[in-house]
Amino acid sequence: MKCLIVGGSGQFGITLSKILNKRKNYKIDITTRSISKTKSKLKKYGLKKVRLIKLNILNKNQILKILSKKYDYIFYFAGQSSPDLSFKKINQTLESNYLGCKNFLEILKYLNLNTKFFNSSSSEIFSDTKKKLNIFSKKKPISPYGRSKLLSFNLTKKFRKIYKLKTYNLVLFNSESYFREKKYLIPKICLAAIKAKNSNKITGFGKLDVIREWNWCEEQCNLILNCMFKKPNDFILSNGKEYSGYQMLKYAFNYLKLDYKKYIKNEKKFYRKKDFKLKRSDFRKNINQINPSWKPKIYGKIIIYKLIKYYQKNKIV
């Protein structure tokens, strides 16, 4: 089975590639803006059995050439993924999350391919609510990132309903892995605890009272594998385990036997321009669509412990 992972150098691209690599009947191609940088990154994480293809997702001629190879599955993971940064990079966020996706859908329609297309969406597409979220919940994003993801969500759905393409939306809640960029909250928390342990360093944070479902990326990718064999639809992939930033912070510092209050400070420069205080999923309703027997194994303190051990072992600070 031929798989194309668009934007394959991020945590989802790397994680899904590693899983598919273990299966004998999958051939994986990854698109990237920089062959040399991505090759070095994949080598670092022990990912060898993939082919790299240079691609500008805004260039439809390049996409046409690539898709003429007739892939069985296409995973669209490209895109600027920071809600906070999206306020500063509005055009880049829109181009990468929406226009690139639009180009792929239009070329798939033009070639009349039977390919299954998976668009990575986000919990940021929903409105601010205390209710548990399912795929039909009200959608009203508050950031350019969320708006760009909602545009691609709606377009992916449109191409499925009107043009009968085999298109899927994968609505992903917060995800963590060894490959996650260190600027995000959970890696920052883990690294702050390590720095406090090693050198008594104090780290500045924004608001830590936000509540999220932090997932382990590999578990979400295993759910994606389940979705691959479902009828084209829209799915929420999250574990239903909610924790505040403070809870995750306490897990990290307690693990290293430290009092976090001595090593963190609140700094307004880290506040997001706009943010949701709470994001939680209607886990049982969502998971029944994918695999009713599935249960998460890695969440909460387990995520924190895994990351700290990995960072310490690989001397990442």
Stretches with model-predicted labels:
Residues 83-84, 119-133, 144-150, 175-179:
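Conserved catalytic-site region of short-chain dehydrogenase/reductase
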Residues 3-23:
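N-terminal Rossmann NAD(P)H-binding glycine-rich loop of SDR-like oxidoreductase domains
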Residues 45-59:
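Rossmann-fold cofactor-recognition segment
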Residues 55-95:
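NAD(P)H-binding glycine-rich loop region in Rossmannoid oxidoreductase-like domains
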Residues 116, 122, 154-178, 187-190, ...:
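Conserved beta-loop-beta element that borders a ligand/cofactor-binding pocket
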